[in-house]
C-alpha cells in the first residue's frame, strides 16, 4: 500500500491551533485581560508557508528573497486577528475557515508588494545612473580632470535601458 505524502503544514492541526488562539483573543477582549501570544506552532506554520511559497518558480530567483519572506511573515502576523475560524457561506451555512489558504494569500500579496517596491527602487537607481552618465560625459568634454564615468558593458546597458522602458510603460498603463 502506498504511503500518503505528508504535507509541510497540517491544515487540520493548524485550524485547531488558530481556533484556540482566536478563542483566547476573544476571551481576553471580553475580560480585559492580556492577549495570548501567538503559539510556536502557528508561528512555525506561517514560517513554513512563507518559505515554501518563496521556492515557487515565480519567486525563486529574486535576490531579495529574505526580505520577501520577512514581509510575508510580518503581514501574516499583522492580519492574524482578521482570520475567522468559522464563516457563513451564501446559503447561510456555517463553514470552517482554511488557515493555510488565508495565510498563503496574505504572504503571496506581501511578496508581490516587495517585488514592486524593489523594482521601483531599482528604477530610481537606474535613472540616477543614466542621468549621472549623461552629465559626466558632458563634464568630460568640459574638463578632463573630472572624469567619473560608470563603466558598463553593452549587455548591462541594454538591460538597464529595457528595464527603465518597461517600468515606465507599466506605470503609464496604470494611470
PLM region descriptions:
Residues 1-67, 135-175:
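Extreme N-terminal regulatory/targeting segments of RNA polymerase sigma factors
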Residues 19-22, 73, 77:
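Regular secondary-structure segments
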Residues 56-65, 76-106, 117-122:
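Short alpha-helix-to-loop micro-motif enriched in aromatics/charged/Gly
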Residues 71, 92-93, 127-132:
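Glycine/charge-rich, flexible interdomain linkers and switch-proximal surface loops
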Residues 104-107, 113-115, 135-144:
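Glycine- and acidic-residue-rich phosphate-binding/metal-coordinating active-site segment common to enzymes
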Residues 117-138:
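Short, basic/polar amphipathic helix motif occurring as a linker/hinge flanking DNA-binding modules
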Amino acid at each position: 500500500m502506498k504511503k500518503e505524502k505528508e504535507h509541510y503544514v497540517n491544515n487540520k492541526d493548524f485550524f485547531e491551533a488558530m481556533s484556540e488562539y482566536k478563542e483566547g483573543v476573544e476571551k481576553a477582549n471580553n475580560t480585559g485581560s492580556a492577549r495570548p501570544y501567538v503559539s510556536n506552532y502557528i508561528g512555525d506554520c506561517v514560517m513554513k508557508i512563507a518559505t515554501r511559497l518563496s521556492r515557487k518558480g515565480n519567486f525563486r530567483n529574486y535576490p531579495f528573497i529574505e526580505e520577501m519572506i520577512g514581509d510575508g511573515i510580518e503581514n501574516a502576523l499583522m492580519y492574524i486577528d482578521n482570520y475567522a475560524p468559522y464563516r457563513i457561506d451564501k446559503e447561510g451555512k456555517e463553514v470552517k475557515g482554511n488557515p493555510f489558504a488565508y495565510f498563503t494569500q496574505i504572504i503571496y500579496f506581501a511578496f508581490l508588494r516587495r517585488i514592486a517596491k524593489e523594482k521601483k527602487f531599482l528604477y530610481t537607481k537606474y535613472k540616477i545612473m543614466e542621468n549621472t552618465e549623461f552629465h559626466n560625459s558632458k563634464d568630460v568634454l568640459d574638463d578632463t580632470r573630472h572624469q567619473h564615468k560608470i563603466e558598463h558593458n553593452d549587455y548591462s546597458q541594454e538591460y538597464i535601458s529595457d528595464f527603465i522602458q518597461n517600468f515606465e510603460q507599466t506605470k503609464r498603463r496604470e494611470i
